[in-house]
């Protein structure tokens, strides 16, 4: 297959020593399972390949997903998608206010419900001092958490007998459940594609 020729590696699992049997898992990991996300990843990888003046006989490796040249460009794209979505319902000031919250996570891309509440409390203190009209999405901690989940900015994590379950809104949404609810009192993680733009996490610890 042409895919296996250009991406001849197994995608590493983030939390175990095992690997997935296809590099395509890396693409899904960074995407929201939308075709345009996959095409954007391919476009950035191709652009970087050319900019690095690599030989035409070379192929891609898993390290290409960890290079700043990729993570910055792709993270900027994903954040732009969030901004475009919000622009239909909220002002640019609301968008900037949303981004302000992530400063209170102190660089952490993974956090507990208790840590989320602590960050939200500090976020509210900032709003009370600096914002005249508070947006509806940050009225309460749970409303704000649901808002982040609806935007696919965060997922909830639940431990199972096999391995952790990651609940994403885009996966949980179905014809019979068009407005899935985020799990409260769980653990949470910011989407991989947004970490760089939000200045969260150092890198992914592939084992």
Model-identified regions with their sequence ranges:
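C-terminal leucine-rich, beta-strand-based interaction scaffolds used for sensing/assembly
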Residues: 2-207
């Amino acid at each position: 297959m042409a895919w296996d020729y250009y991406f001849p590696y197994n995608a590493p699992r983030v939390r175990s020593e095992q690997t997935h049997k296809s590099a395509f898992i890396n693409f899904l990991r960074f995407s929201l399972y939308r075709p345009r996300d996959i095409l954007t990843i391919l476009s950035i990888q191709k652009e970087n390949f050319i900019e690095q003046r690599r030989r035409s006989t070379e192929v891609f490796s898993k390290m290409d997903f960890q290079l700043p040249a990729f993570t910055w460009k792709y993270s900027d794209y994903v954040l732009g998608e969030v901004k475009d979505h919000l622009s239909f319902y909220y002002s640019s000031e609301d968008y900037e206010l949303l981004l302000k919250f992530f400063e209170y996570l102190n660089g952490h891309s993974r956090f507990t419900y208790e840590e989320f509440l602590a960050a939200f409390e500090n976020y509210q203190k900032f709003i009370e001092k600096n914002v005249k009209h508070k947006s509806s999405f940050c009225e309460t901690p749970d409303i704000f958490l649901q808002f982040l989940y609806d935007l696919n900015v965060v997922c909830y994590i639940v431990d199972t007998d096999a391995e952790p379950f990651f609940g994403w809104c885009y996966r949980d949404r179905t014809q019979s459940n068009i407005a899935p609810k985020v799990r409260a009192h769980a653990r949470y993680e910011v989407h991989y594609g947004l970490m760089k733009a939000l200045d969260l996490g150092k890198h992914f610890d592939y084992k």
